[in-house]
């Protein structure tokens, strides 16, 4: 009997240690740390790690498509998702935990991407809608006022990629006065992805507006404005993508 009790005690000890080891193997890291996994090609993340941050961009107002951008204090990462209404699953500005083990990671210039194993021309495939909440968990909210960084055009850096920034004192360049946020294809009558150019008097900022953006047909104010959005990559260049209609007059 004593032998049986001793055996059971040892077995429970081993199981308990195994659970402790599982907990130890799961650890948090920063978005910046994810760059250490990036190689010349898309690779799988083998380690049981997660990042915590805020949803700084999604498909709300049609500004992005099938994508959610999560940022912490060190940077941002885009997760490609096969869902038509990401906002209903991962609301803008919500606090989330992204479990990275098993996801594939790639570098699109200075832009960090997460998704599933690529099967075609894209760097990563989209995470199926049924699996989204397996990888991205909503967390209790706290003060998210610090997710927006104040910048000028001149102070934008590579490390700001996929983070939320706000830039004051911007004016549409004279050549584009009177324009809508997005151009309209004369053949189809539909809006198209458009690049607009703003200046602060010294430097020029390219702002990209998606064809699907809900305010694509609004006129751009011909006055000094503040724009808030994410730093993104478009046509090989760093640009600003306005998020949540982050347009206000100074």
Named regions from a protein language model:
Residues 1-16:
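Sec-dependent bacterial lipoprotein signal peptides
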Residues 17-95, 99-250:
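OB-fold nucleic-acid-binding modules
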């Amino acid at each position: 009997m004593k032998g049986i009790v001793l055996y059971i005690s040892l077995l429970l000890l081993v199981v308990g240690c195994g659970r402790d080891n599982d907990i130890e193997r799961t650890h948090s890291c920063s978005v910046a740390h994810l760059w250490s996994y990036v190689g010349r090609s898309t690779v799988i993340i083998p380690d049981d790690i997660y990042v915590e941050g805020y949803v700084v961009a999604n498909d709300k107002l049609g500004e992005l498509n099938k994508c959610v951008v999560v940022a912490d204090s060190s940077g941002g990462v885009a997760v490609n998702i096969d869902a038509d209404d990401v906002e209903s699953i991962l609301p803008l500005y919500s606090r989330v935990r992204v479990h990275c083990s098993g996801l594939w990671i790639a570098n699109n210039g200075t832009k960090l991407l997460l998704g599933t194993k690529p099967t075609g021309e894209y760097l990563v495939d989209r995470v199926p809608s049924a699996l989204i909440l397996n990888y991205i968990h909503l967390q209790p909210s706290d003060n998210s006022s610090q997710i927006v960084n104040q910048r000028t055009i001149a102070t934008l850096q590579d490390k700001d990629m996929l983070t939320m920034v706000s830039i004051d004192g911007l004016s549409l360049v004279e050549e584009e006065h009177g324009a809508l946020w997005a151009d309209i294809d004369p053949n189809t009558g539909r809006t198209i992805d458009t690049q607009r150019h703003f200046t602060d008097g010294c430097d020029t900022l390219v702002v990209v507006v998606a064809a699907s953006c809900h305010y694509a047909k609004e006129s751009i104010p011909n006055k000094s404005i503040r724009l808030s959005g994410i730093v993104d990559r478009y046509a090989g260049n760093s640009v600003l993508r306005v998020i949540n209609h982050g347009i206000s007059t100074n």
